[in-house]
């Protein structure tokens, strides 16, 4: 790979640290603040050069869609720092679909993403209702199994129609609001939902 300038290296290191810490890449604004740049267009220019040099891959149609090319999941997790979680069916982040409760495969996740006694599973996102939270169509979300949630948390919820969906959870005075992270989509309202777990991370294959 072509050598990076000092500023490009700062941006690349920040993106890597955010992906490792949060499971998804930072926004252009967050990058600008982190490395001391005032202009979003300057950040875009550096990202373009990082892409041309083979360090990242971007999808211009999706926000936050920055993939670190050298961060293949298998490579970034040393054997003693990884655990394996089952991929259970598929959950739609858009139009809910009935959850399929069978294990399709196992994938490595960071041991630091959950405690040793936590039950975790992975679900595949099908849809674009959470793109503004950095959760894209085809991503695998890492979910800590629990039956409670705090307002504002991203959860996997089973609706009254026994369909599962990934949304941001809000308990209001007399209803539950499941809020998409997509300005083009409306919230969903229910008298009651069953919380299956809280999203604690994200697994993204790099193709």
From Swiss-Prot:
Q: Name one GO biological process term.
A: DNA repair
Give this protein's Gene Ontology molecular function annotations: DNA binding; serine-type endopeptidase activity
**The protein's enzyme class:** hydrolase
DNA-binding residues per UniProt?
28-48
Assembly, per entry? Homodimer.
- Write out the similarity annotation: Belongs to the peptidase S24 family.
| Record site: Cleavage | 93-94
Q: Which Gene3D superfamilies match?
A: Umud Fragment, subunit A (2.10.109.10), Winged helix-like DNA-binding domain superfamily/Winged helix DNA-binding domain (1.10.10.10)
Which organism does this record belong to? Oceanobacillus iheyensis (strain DSM 14371 / CIP 107618 / JCM 11309 / KCTC 3954 / HTE831)
Q: Which residues form the active site?
A: 129 (for autocatalytic cleavage activity), 167 (for autocatalytic cleavage activity)
Q: What does this protein do?
A: Represses a number of genes involved in the response to DNA damage (SOS response), including recA and lexA. In the presence of single-stranded DNA, RecA interacts with LexA causing an autocatalytic cleavage which disrupts the DNA-binding part of LexA, leading to derepression of the SOS regulon and eventually DNA repair.
* Name the UniProt record assigns to this protein: LexA repressor
Keywords in alphabetical order: Autocatalytic cleavage, DNA damage, DNA repair, DNA replication, DNA-binding, Hydrolase, Repressor, SOS response, Transcription, Transcription regulation
